[in-house]
From Swiss-Prot:
Organism from which the protein derives: Chromobacterium violaceum (strain ATCC 12472 / DSM 30191 / JCM 1249 / CCUG 213 / NBRC 12614 / NCIMB 9131 / NCTC 9757 / MK)
Pfam families with a match to the protein in the record: SDH_alpha
Official protein name in the record: UPF0597 protein CV_1824
Family label: Belongs to the UPF0597 family.
Record-level GO BP terms: L-cysteine catabolic process to pyruvate
GO molecular function, one term: L-cysteine desulfhydrase activity
Amino acid sequence: MSEREVRLWPEFVKALKQEVVPALGCTEPISLALAAALAARELGKAPERIDAWVSANLMKNGMGVTVPGTGTVGLPIAAAVGALGGDPDAKLEVLKNLTVEQVAAGKQMLADGKVKLGVAAVPNILYAEACVWHGDECARVAIADAHTNVIKIELNGEVKLKREAADAKPVETYDLGDATARDVYDFAMRAPLDSIAFIHDAAVLNSALADEGMSGKYGLHIGATLQRQIEAGLLSEGLLSNILTRTTAASDARMGGATLPAMSNSGSGNQGIAATMPVVAVAEHVKADRETLIRALALSHLIAVYIHTRLPKLSALCAVTTASMGAAAGMAQLLNGGYPAVSMAISSMIGDLAGMICDGASNSCAMKVSTSAGSGYKAVLMALDGTRVTGNEGIVAHDVDVSIANLGKLATQGMAQTDTQILQIMMDKR
């Protein structure tokens, strides 16, 4: 191993272990549910009412999504059931043990006007705070900058925990600052298998979500619709159709409130699905063995993380597009394209999808998952044929890492006003 590999490879393993984790339900409402669950535990008494505040971006991403196990949309129900039945030790799976009675109690709390929600005047892009009351007693918990990153705990005004968000981040932080796409590729292809074998769980969890989504009872049931159109002769069978139906079905289930966890990426279940299911579909098509699948998944998820480190945690840019760039890398490798095809496919996707907006988490996210998966496979086919969007076109550069950096600039600097306008439009609809 080179000195560079000795330094970077442990960072890659830490990045995968920190960013690719199971999550039940859309992670923005779940973050508020976790804050409420932690506050309820601190209070130690039956919650009677809840005051909650979230950042503007978290408000945008939580307004239109179904909270798993509840059949109800929005942040207030997440706070209510989090306080009444959440397991604070389960973190992003905080709602995994909800009972029918707890869900009913949460809905009654909403009907009685006992849950108040507002936008917090904070600089944090990701922020969730819950104050859970019993009589005049109150416990307050705040989470900032990462979905499980607790920065404040108070009980009846007494501070139990308070720290700056930067100081509260997980011990296992990682640094991909000077990494390149080529570094990621070399790691995924040559790392000891036992150091990345855990990534196979992504295929297991997200495939189960896809199977559940194919039942047709979740969200916009796009995956199931596409399958019915195949059977009706309106859409041809084949690898592309399989990629689209399975990837989209998993997102349907995820956004439609299925009580199954997704393997997330960079704090998002849809990003985890987007980075997983196209790779799984292609691996099955080429009859890849377990090691080949694991390495393709590691490549996909780590490329997704690498690109996301160049983006804000939440922004106006739909990050399913960037997670799907990881999937394109994994698919290109499975189809024997090697690193040249990987870099070409990513460049073409930036030329294709850059600027797709995030207008909040909702059932329609599955549309964007489908679009991004299709773009990824198209870019791979182009790369295998020696074609890519070139550095002479738009924000795409000759070098893939420069193209990724340009995409990051677009999201960070160019789309800030877009984000504000999207939220205003959504708030006007309430």
